[in-house]
Amino acid sequence: MKLSDFDFDLPEDLIATRPAVPRTSARLLVAKGRQISDSIVSDLPNWLSPGDRLVLNDTRVIPARLTGARHRDTAQGPMQARIEVTLLEPDAQGNWSALIKPLKKVKIAEEIIFSDRLRATLRAVKDGQGVLQFNLEGDDFDAALNAAGAMPLPPYIATRRPADERDKSDYQTVFAQNSGAVAAPTASLHFDKALLSELAARGVLFSYVTLHVGAGTFLPVKVEDVTTHKMHAEWGQVSAAAAAEINATKQAGKRVIPVGTTALRLIETAGREGQIKAWEGDTDIFIYPGFRFNVADALMTNFHLPKSTLMMLVSALMGYDEVRAIYDHAVAEKYRFFSYGDASLLIPQRD
C-alpha cells in the first residue's frame, strides 16, 4: 500500500479559508456505498433515522498561538526579541510543551511576556520543543490566554491569512466543553443549536466523547509504505455513560455515526475488543484499508488532504475505489475542502 495511492489533484481555489455562514448552509455530499448525492448540512435530519446515534467530540480549542517578547539585560542595556509560541499540550504539572520561534533566542529560565497578565518561563528544551511554565493556572490562565492568544489555524489557512477574532467563534464547536485541543474537530463545526434540536426532535441520539486534537494531526506522512507510518498520540476519554449509550444503540440494531475522524478514532480505540468500554489515555490508532471497524457504522467528515492519514481512514471505511469516486465528484462539483470546507456523510455498503 503506497502513499501515492492516496494522492489526488486539488485546485487551490477549493481550499476554504472561511466557513460557510450560517454553519448549516455548508454543502453535504452523501455517499451510500457507490451512490453519491448532493445535499446541504441543514438537510442532515433527512439522511438519518430515529435511533441513530451521533458521537460528538466535545473538546474545546484553545487560542494556542501567542506572540510575546523576551527581555534580557545586557552590557549594552536592555534588549528584547519578538517570540512566537504555539502551545502543543500540557504535562501533569501544568507546564506546556510548545513550538517556540526562534527558540535559539530564549535561554533556560528566561521569561517571555505575552501581555500584562500572561507570561511564561522556559524550563527545558526537548526534541526541538520548549517546555513553558506559565504564571497563571486554572480559570485565570484560561481567561488570560483567551485574551492574548489567537486560534491555531491549520497551515493551509494560516499561510493564506492570519487568524482574527472571527476565528475564535468560527473555529470552535457550539458544544465545546473540555479545553485542550490545538485543532478543531472540524466536521462538528457545521452544527448549530437549531440543527441539534431538530435532530433530537427527529429521534436522533447523541453521545459526547473527548479527544484533544493535537498539532500532529497536520504532520505529513513521510514513508511510501503507509503501513510503516507511526501515528502521533492524542489524549482522549470515553466515559462509562457514553460507552453504555453506544453499546445500547448497537444492541438495538441502530447506527453509530461519529462526527469527525477524531470521534471515530477514539471510539474504535475504546472498542478494540468488539464492544466499546469506558476508556481514557493516549491513542495512536492508525486506520488504513484492511482495518476492521467494531463500532462506527458511518462517518460524517470534511474533505481531507491528499496523501493524509485521514484519506487512508475514509478509504478503510468506504473502500479505495469508492473514495476515489467521492473525491472526483467533490472536485468536479467544486465542494470546499479542509477545515472550513464542506462536509460528507459516508455510509459504507455492508455485505
Swiss-Prot record:
Pathway(s) where this gene product acts: tRNA modification; tRNA-queuosine biosynthesis
Record keywords, A-Z: Cytoplasm, Queuosine biosynthesis, S-adenosyl-L-methionine, Transferase
Example GO biological process: queuosine biosynthetic process
EC number: 2.4.99.17
Enzyme class: transferase
Taxonomy, superkingdom: Bacteria
Family of this protein: Belongs to the QueA family.
Name of the featured protein: S-adenosylmethionine:tRNA ribosyltransferase-isomerase
Native source organism of the sequence: Roseobacter denitrificans (strain ATCC 33942 / OCh 114) (Erythrobacter sp. (strain OCh 114))
